[in-house]
UniProtKB/Swiss-Prot annotation:
Residue stretches making up the Dilute domain: 668-908
Modified residues (Phosphothreonine): 1211, 1232, 1330
Originating gene: AFDN
Species of the source: Homo sapiens
Record flagged with keyword Acetylation: yes
Protein name: Afadin
PANTHER family, A to Z: AFADIN
Molecular-function GO term, any one: small GTPase binding
Length: 1824
């Protein structure tokens, strides 16, 4: 026997022994089997002393290997019956039960025989008998020839019996004689007399007592066992269909066999045939040894009122073996008399009716009406033909049946009705003529409509009148028509049925069976085989409705062939178990038209047996966890493989037992491979999480599967162990990672060391872990346990450092506050993740320790407070903390008596508690968290995943291509993966399918009109999707934001479809367009709403899922799975704050998980959605960006938040993934809607501005943006790769360095932050900066507390929509923004246009040349126009300073200012107002609160903020900034070099080209000098000095340059003079003309915009877009990152041109989600972030745009086209505001222009950076 087989045997044997031991007396316990399956136990043996007429008893220990012979020999010695050894006795061992005895064969094993009593909890005894003993009624107990030897030898030695004994002996002999005579009367009983004789004697002499029995409490045990057996049997009836009515009890009489027993009750199913009932009855009557073939059950019909014993008038019919007694009994009408069943010997002349019918040419499946009464429904129900209702026109049947609950349709539930056609006439009509009638109501149904006749296996339909509309296969009939299986029959106008005849189907499937089958064969419509026989062996005929199913036809025939193999109960995977047949109603109810579900898995898998090992190995051993898109793919594939092996499609020839063994072997193989892979990758966190998730999910599948669960117990144990093993390894990996950053908790804020880890690193590690677990879809309960371990580790590490290192000085108020503050970040993070309970619990000791360090502990009054606060600390810990406490210089000492008191109290409380729990009281925290590992009971993916999960097909594709396997989707499956689960509620599957998918088809949703009064937005999040059968996209409410207008109104709910807004239809519009329309509404909005349209259109699941196409570049969590529903609402987090104008200023930690939103409950159908950790249970969006909707509803979904829609969570910084699982780089379809536009337009939640208290210290990279764009559509996980993160991180850093964070914002936008909603953003960015003062008690006597350690904000990367054309801003908006958007120091040729991006550099250069002249003309024009515009702007500004709500006319509301990286010439003027902005934007002044901490980094130019701004003391930023600038500078020089080389290489240059070459050479030299100069100074400058010095250096360089230029000019003056004059005149003319045109167009456009946008669009917005676009195009080279800024609150207004330093700015505006739309349009590259800036800067910034300027970032390449037109129009409007000439890069300026600039003392070098150019222009204008 193989090792596996032996183990299996041993396990089974152990189970049996365990069962025995559980019910038997301790004395008779049996030992566990050894490796050789040997076991031992004590047995009691009796010895019958015939002479004495009594029994002796002994107990001996027996081995399972001991034979009867061995035992007899031992017993002969023990009982010593023949001490004198005068005889040669022959002993036998008998097994005696109350009902009889049996002699054991000589080689039987008595202990094994005894163990077999276990089977039916029998009690018995073993009796040693001397076969030579003479028994007076000789031969009465003869058991064989040997017994007749030497009778009476022992009598010679018989002692004299007493009178009493003689009497008893006589009595026994009489009894024996009587029994002998009985035996003659009842010959069939064979050895009964012999059997019962010894039994009677032994039980009479030794009656049942606790001494003589083995069972510990026989009555209870027997009762319990009977009960269990009964329950098990009942469970079988129930398990097949969930209802108990498929089985019950039946009385079986046996008057002729056992006249003294009235009857026996047996338990039967309605499908149990008569031969089964015979076997059961024989066993009950104690005749189990008889051959059941010799017996039969007869159905006896007694006249009504007759007694069972009355023979008169009784009609008896013997049942055929395949008839079902219980079914017959149940269907027997009481008025026809009494029906009883008799067990009797089968008459030798009996011919089964089946055979009779054969002779008459009838089908063996049809039944005779047995008693001639016309009733005759004796067929098992599943063999009767039936009608199953379909829904005409795909109308949902159950909607109709809700209304007909009183009908007799064989089903009380809302399911398709199914009517069995009995062997008689069945009337159809509105009248209920008899029990068999089919009662229907509806148009066209007559009282007696038609008759269905089932005779001789043929079913016909006959209309009763000409008015009775009856159709067969669509043809109206008027005369009797024969029905064939699969035909559709319609009664009246609306009742459509499918006729199904199992016997016909079976006949075709099994042509080789009896000849009678062939009678039906010809009548069967060709081509319907597959249609009607689909799944015959299980979910009967659920395939009949699918004649069109091409893909399943092969499977169908396979199933047909296996269908009749009832031995394979539940083994056939695609079919539902045969045991389900009893509930024919449920099953037939599935037989609907092609839209009806079929109870099978959503897909099945087939693999060749020969490639089984390769297949499993590919799935397990060679799966790279990082490249799998749907992380649970292995689980689903392996489960399908198990079901395949269980099915008859896998090796149809093998027996059920072999199949079972095969399944066990396959599962064991899977498990052992999984174990190997986990061991091999035990140090790789990503792989461990992946396999932990898969092992736990597979374990759940196997455990829950009703077939697999019983046969894979060993594998289940191993899998459970594997889950735990992977868990432990993963904990170890994560703790090791965490250990590297733990010193961050002890980071002294005053030291500010760059090398030391920051708390951010800890949070990043935790976030990476959470991201990893979510990406791998690890069960929420496991996630909680894992983080409990991590929190415990943090607690243990910190606590042990505190208490074990007294010299470290950590036990002080100062360090207590620091550690507590750092822990606050962890707690806030945990709360954000829904792990607050775990954090509270496992961080409690260190939290209490830090609280102790910072609280008052100087007077006796403090003792109670200390003990109540530090209740978790034991006496040793308290003592250590207090004794090691280092007092601050002016802090009082802790009194010794206080320490003693505190310790004493702890000894009586915490210490006692620990001891009572069995823990030692010790100083240090135990590194091991003493908690048992618990396997989750629920929350598995199978509860949530519907249909074939996205990514599963891709996972299998390589295997399918190599021929290992194939995946067969089952489109008509209900879509759930729990079909085969124990107790799975199939009805609910169907019900759910019907409610969600079919319901919409029965009627249209209710349409209502809702009028909302907006305050700050509608408060809706919308999503566009196309429902089943819909041609156009619909706009659906994804959720309602709390506190918003819609929420206040109360009528809108998630799932409602928005049909129109203010009379403008939204049907068929893209999400972007709909969002735009919705934002353009006035304060009163009228919406036309189809209530619950999503559900009516089959999109219910859409509402429960995050928008699928969105990807989070900046989100470390990676995507890859459909998330449970709760996550879908996560994005509305913070809605409470955002929704109300008076939101309080909450610390980060308070942004907790959103409460369930309206409609939430309805949508969250799954238990996995809301576990103890709301966020932990969440899973990222569906891989591949497609939601797991029910098949067929390929919903094109995008998710937009309109108006106030998008109160999004903040996203975590795009930093390198802590545990990246990089995925393959092929592009997946994240954008399934037209044009590659990203999904959601979002601004950060109003209250969650990124508070970059301390910027992450990262490195910058100038190419980030372009890389991000190129990577945009790759899978989310790929974007999580380290490199990507590095880039993201660089970008963020660069942004932060400039303190206006523009890079950061753009980074997300240009990365096409394709995530519509920040559902997944873990956001530990806006951590509250709990200052120490809040941690320590405020009041006198506080000692030095650490400076508020700013939470290093992990850059909040707000998802920014790049997919939308720039929609109008919400109404009154004044965007203040000093846009650093372009981090470019370029005096370069304008970048190429969008279509040139990415072209070879030669083409780029050519494109630049083509545009150059035009740009130069622009530059001169700009200045003049800007001056005119300036006055107008100022007037508008003054007017608007008092009008918050009419700010839309403010100039350049969202000016796309170019990177203001240059030092402004007048830093002081700029700096003051900006600081004012930062300091004074207090929440109470803001209608839309923006927290101060939020604003701190949303401000102004880099220089001002870095110069002395206390908010950014960090040199990292400077490094990053300088590095970025250096790279840009180098790039500029490279570009110049290229163009110079190009020009030099030309053999003959035109005069213009020569001039250009000269200028470029100068520029190149200048840039080189500038670079050298910067290089020299960059190491030792302070940030402020750096900025000032840089300006001075640049001025000096510029002066040198000016001198050089003048010399050059003098030398070339003669030859160039004329040319310059001509050029200048031409330019002036062209510019004048152009300016006139532009001004006219500006006015025209402005008017048009105002009308179009109802006052929301301002000319300034347009100007801003145009200008910024022009500036971008002019200033950015192709590599320039397209950078965006976070918007300032909308209501924020810039300070007036010369604001009073202390004047508080007006309240900020709220961030509207539409801002995100503007990200990558050329005119909106910088729109997503605004920065406070003053009016002068605004104007200066405006000047930089030119009509063809282009944001040369790769951003332009993506989705920019729609925006371009709009942008150009808007650009034109602001042309008059642009500054003349000065806006060009230096090499594009004419020499005169340069001279003029120099003469005015302006620094041409400032042109290198956009912001400096702006500053220069600003200054120039100010001085005019």
């Amino acid at each position: 026997m193989s090792a596996g087989g032996r183990d299996e045997e041993r396990r089974k044997l152990a189970d049996i022994i365990h069962h025995w031991n559980a019910n038997r007396l301790d004395l008779f316990e049996i030992s566990q089997p050894t490796e050789d399956l040997e076991f031992h136990g004590v047995m009691r043996f009796y010895f019958q002393d015939k002479a004495a007429g009594n029994f002796a008893t002994k107990c001996i220990r027996v081995s399972s290997t001991a034979t009867t012979q061995d035992v007899i020999e031992t017993l002969a010695e023990k009982f010593r019956p023949d001490m004198r050894m005068l005889s040669s006795p022959k002993y036998s061992l008998y097994e005696v039960h109350v009902s009889g005895e049996r002699r054991l064969d000589i080689d039987e094993k008595p202990l094994v025989v005894q163990l077999n009593w276990n089977k039916d909890d029998r009690e018995g005894r073993f009796v040693l008998k001397n076969e030579n003993d003479a028994i007076p009624p000789k031969k009465a107990q003869s058991n064989g020839p040997e017994k007749q030897e030497k009778e009476g030898v022992i009598q010679n030695f018989k002692r004299t019996l007493s009178k009493k004994e003689k009497k008893e002996k006589k009595k026994r002999e009489k009894e024996a004689l009587r029994q002998a005579s009985d035996k003659d009367d009842r010959p069939f009983q064979g050895e009964d007399v012999e059997n019962s004789r010894l039994a009677a004697e032994v039980y009479k002499d030794m009656p049942e007592t606790s001494f003589t029995r083995t069972i510990s409490n026989p009555e209870v045990v027997m009762k319990r066992r009977r009960q269990q057996k009964l329950e098990k049997r009942m469970q079988e009836f129930r398990s097949s269909d969930g209802r108990p009515d498929s089985g019950g009890t039946l009385r079986i009489y046996a008057d002729s066999l056992k006249p003294n027993i009235p009857y026996k009750t047996i338990l039967l199913s309605t499908t149990d045939p008569a031969d089964f009932a015979v076997a059961e009855a024989l066993e009950k009557y104690g005749l189990e040894k008889e051959n059941p073939k010799d017996y039969c059950i007869a159905r006896v019909m007694l006249p009504p009122g007759a007694q069972h014993s009355d023979e008169k008038g009784a009609k008896e019919i013997i049942l055929d073996d395949d008839e079902c007694p219980l079914q017959i009994f149940r269907e027997w009408p009481s008025d026809k008399g009494i029906l009883v069943f008799q067990l009797k010997r089968r008459p030798p002349d009996h011919i089964p009716k089946k055979t009779k019918k054969h002779l008459e040419g009838k089908t063996p499946k049809g039944k005779e009406r047995a008693d001639g009464s016309g009733y005759g429904s004796t067929l098992p129900p599943e063999k009767l033909p039936y009608l199953v209702e379909l829904s005409p026109g795909r109308r949902n049947h159950f909607a109709y049946y809700n209304y007909h609950t009183y009908e007799d349709g064989s089903d009380s539930r809302d399911k398709p009705k199914l009517y069995r056609l009995q062997l008689s006439v069945t009337e159809v009509g509105t009248e209920k003529l008899d029990d068999n009638s089919i009662q229907l109501f509806g148009p066209g149904i007559q009282p007696h409509h038609c008759d269905l006749t089932n005779m001789d296996g043929v079913v016909t339909v006959t209309p009763r009148s000409m008015d009775a509309e009856t159709y067969v296969e669509g043809q109206r009939i008027s005369e009797t028509t024969m029905l064939q299986s699969g035909m559709k029959v319609q009664f009246g106008a609306s009742h459509v049925f499918k006729f199904v005849d199992p016997s016909q189907d079976h006949a075709l499937a099994k042509r080789s069976v009896d000849g009678g089958l062939m009678v039906k064969g010809p009548r069967h419509k060709p081509g319907i085989v597959q249609e009607t026989t689909f799944d015959l062996g299980g979910d009967i005929h659920s395939g009949t409705a699918l004649p069109t199913s091409k893909s399943t036809t092969r499977l169908d025939s396979d199933r047909v062939s296996s269908a009749s193999s009832t031995a394979e109960r539940g083994m056939v995977k695609p079919m539902i178990r045969v045991e389900q047949q009893p509930d024919y109603r449920r099953q037939e109810s599935r037989t609907q038209d092609a839209s009806g579900p079929e109870l099978i898995l959503p897909a099945s898998i087939e693999f060749r047996e020969s490639s089984e090992d390769s297949f499993l190995s590919a799935i397990i051993n060679y799966t790279n966890s990082s490249t799998v898109h749907f992380k649970l793919s292995p689980t689903y594939v392996l489960y399908m493989a198990c079901r395949y092996v269980l099915s008859n499609q896998y090796r149809p020839d093998i027996s059920p037992t072999e199949r079972t063994h095969k399944v066990i072997a396959v599962v064991n193989k899977m498990v052992s491979m999984m174990e190997g892979v986990i061991q091999k990758q035990k140090n790789i966190a990503g792989a461990l999480a992946f396999w932990m998730a898969n092992a736990s999910e597979l374990l759940n599948f196997i455990k829950q599967d009703r077939d697999l669960s019983r046969i894979t117990l060993d594998a289940q144990d191993v899998l459970a162990h594997l889950v735990q093993m992977a868990f432990k390894y993963l904990v170890h990996c994560l703790q090791s990672e965490l250990n590297n950053y733990m010193p961050a908790f002890l980071d002294d804020p005053e030291e500010n060391s760059l090398q030391r880890p920051k708390i951010d690193d800890v949070l990043h590690t935790l976030t990476g872990a959470m991201s990893l677990l979510r990406r791998c879809r690890v069960n929420a309960a496991l996630t909680i346990q894992l983080f409990s371990q991590l929190f415990h580790f943090i607690n243990m590490w910190l606590f042990n450092r505190l208490v074990t290192d007294p010299d470290s000085g950590l036990c002080s108020h100062y360090w207590g506050a620091i550690i507590r503050q750092q822990l606050g970040h962890i707690e806030a993070w945990a709360e954000k993740q829904g792990l607050e309970l775990a954090a509270d619990c496992h961080l409690s000791r260190i939290v209490q320790a830090t609280t102790l360090l910072t609280m008052d502990k100087y007077a006796p009054d403090d003792i109670p407070n200390i003990n109540s606060t530090c209740f978790k600390l034991n006496s040793l810990q308290l003592q250590a903390l207090l004794q090691n406490y280092h007092c601050a210089p002016d802090e009082p000492f802790i009194p010794t008596d206080l320490i003693e008191n505190v310790v004493t109290v702890a000894e009586n409380t915490a210490d006692e508690l620990a001891r009572s729990d069995g823990r030692e009281v010790q100083l240090e925290e135990d590194p091991d968290l003493q908690l048992p590992f618990l396997l989750p009971e629920d929350g598995y993916s199978c509860d949530v995943v519907r249909n074939i999960p996205n990514g599963l097909q891709e996972f299998l594709d390589p295997l399918c291509q190599r021929g290992f396997c194939r995946l067969i989707p089952h489109t008509r499956s209900p879509g759930t993966w729990t079909i085969y689960f124990e107790g799975a509620d199939y009805e609910s599957h169907l019900l759910r399918e019907n409610t969600e998918l079919a319901q919409p088809l029965r009627k249209e949703p209710e349409i209502i009109t809702v009028t909302l009064k907006k305050q700050n937005g509608m408060g809706l999040s919308i999503v566009a999707a196309k429902g089943a059968g819909q041609d156009k996209l619909g706009i659906y409410v994804k959720s309602v934001v709390k506190g918003g207008a819609a929420d206040v109104d109360g009528r809108l709910a998630a799932g409602d479809q928005l049909l129109s807004v203010d009379g403008r239809s939204l049907v068929g519009l893209s999400q972007e367009r709909a969002a735009e329309l919705m934002t353009r509404t006035s304060s009163v909005v009228t919406l036309e709403v189809a209530k619950q349209g999503a559900i009516y259109h089959g999109l219910a699941t859409l509402l429960n899922q995050p928008s699928p196409m969105m990807q989070r570049i900046s989100d470390r969590r990676g995507s890859g799975k459909p998330r449970p529903k709760s996550e879908g609402f996560e994005l509305y987090n913070n809605s409470t704050q955002n929704g109300s104008p008076e939101s309080p200023q909450l610390p980060w930690a308070e942004y907790s998980e959103p409460k369930k939103l309206p409609g939430d409950d309805r949508l969250m159908k799954n238990r996995a959605d809301h576990r103890s950790s709301p966020n932990v249970a969440n899973q990222p969006p569906s891989p591949g960006g497609k939601s797991a909707y029910a098949s067929g509803t390929t919903a094109k979904i995008t998710s937009v938040s309109t108006g106030n829609l998008c109160t999004e969570e903040q996203t975590p910084p795009p930093r390198p993934e802590a545990y990246p699982i990089p995925t393959q780089t092929y592009t997946r379809e994240y954008f399934t809607f037209p044009a590659s536009k990203s999904q959601d337009r979002m601004a950060p939640p109003q209250n969650q501005w990124p508070n970059y208290e301390e910027k992450p210290h990262m490195h910058t990279d100038s190419n980030h943006s372009s890389i991000a764009i190129q990577r945009v559509t790759r899978s989310q996980e790929e974007l999580r790769e380290d490199k990507a993160y590095q880039l993201e991180r660089h970008r963020i850093e660069a942004a932060m360095d400039r303190k206006s964070d523009s890079d950061m914002w753009i980074n997300q936008s240009s990365s096409l932050d394709s995530s519509t909603s920040s559902q997944e953003h873990l956001n530990h960015s806006s951590k509250s900066v709990t200052p120490a003062s809040t941690l320590t008690k405020s009041g006198p006597g506080r000692w030095k507390t650490p400076a508020a350690i700013p939470a290093t904000p992990v850059a909040v990367s707000q998802p920014i929509r790049t997919d939308l054309p720039p929609p109008p801003p919400p109404p009154p908006v004044h965007y203040a923004g000093d846009f650093d958007g372009m981090s470019m120091d370029l005096p370069l040729p304008p970048p190429p246009s969008a279509n040139q991006i990415g072209l070879p550099s030669a083409q780029v250069a050519a494109a630049e040349r083509r545009k150059r002249e035009e740009h130069q003309r622009w530059y001169e024009k700009e200045k003049a126009r800007l001056e005119e515009e300036r006055e107008r702007k100022r007037r508008e500004q003054e007017r608007k300073l008092g009008q918050m709500r009419t700010q839309s006319l403010n100039p350049a509301p969202f000016s796309p200012l170019t990177a203001q990286q240059m030092k402004p010439e007048k830093p002081s003027t700029l700096q003051r107002p900006q600081e004012t902005v930062i300091r004074e934007l207090q929440p109470q002044q803001q209608p839309r609160t923006i927290e101060r901490r939020d604003l701190q980094y949303i401000t102004v130019s880099k220089e001002e903020l870095s110069s002395g701004d206390s908010l950014s003391p960090d040199p990292w930023k400077r490094d990053a900034k300088e590095k970025l600038e250096k790279q840009q500078q180098m790039h500029i020089v490279d570009m110049l070099s290229k163009e110079i080389q190009e020009l030099q290489s030309k053999p003959d240059r035109s005069a213009e080209e020569s001039d250009r070459l000269r200028k470029l050479m100068l520029e190149w030299q200048f840039q080189k000098r500038l670079q050298e100069s910067k290089q020299k100074d960059e190491d030792d400058e302070e940030e402020e000095d750096d900025d000032v010095d840089t300006m001075l250096i640049m001025q000096r360089l510029e002066a040198e340059r000016r001198a050089r230029l003048q010399d050059e000019e003098r030398r070339r003056q003669q030859q160039l003079e004329e040319m310059r004059k001509r050029e200048a005149e031409d330019r002036a003319r062209q510019e004048e003309e152009r300016r006139r045109q532009e001004e006219e167009r500006t006015k025209r456009d402005a008017e048009e915009k105002r009308r179009q946008e109802e006052g929301y669009y301002s000319r300034l917005e347009a100007e801003r877009r145009r200008q910024h676009d022009e500036a971008a195009r002019r200033l950015l080279e192709p590599e320039a990152p397209g950078l965006c800024r976070p918007p300032l609150p909308r209501d924020y207004e810039p300070p007036s041109p010369s604001p009073a330093p202390g004047a508080p700015p007006p309240p900020p505006q709220r961030n509207a989600s539409y801002l995100k739309t503007q990200v990558l349009s050329p005119d909106s590259l910088f729109t997503a972030k605004f920065v406070a800036y003053n009016e002068e800067e605004e104007e200066e910034d405006c000047s930089l745009a030119g009509p063809n300027s282009y944001p040369g970032s790769t951003g332009a390449a993506v989705g920019a086209h729609d925006a371009c037109r709009d942008a150009k129009e808007k650009r034109s409007k602001s042309q008059d505001a642009d500054s003349p000439g000065s806006s060009g890069a230096p090499e594009n300026l004419t020499f005169k222009e340069r001279q003029r600039l120099f003469s005015q003392g302006q620094d041409v070098s400032n042109k290198v950076k956009a912001s400096r150019k702006l500053t220069e222009l600003e200054n120039e204008l100010n001085t005019k």
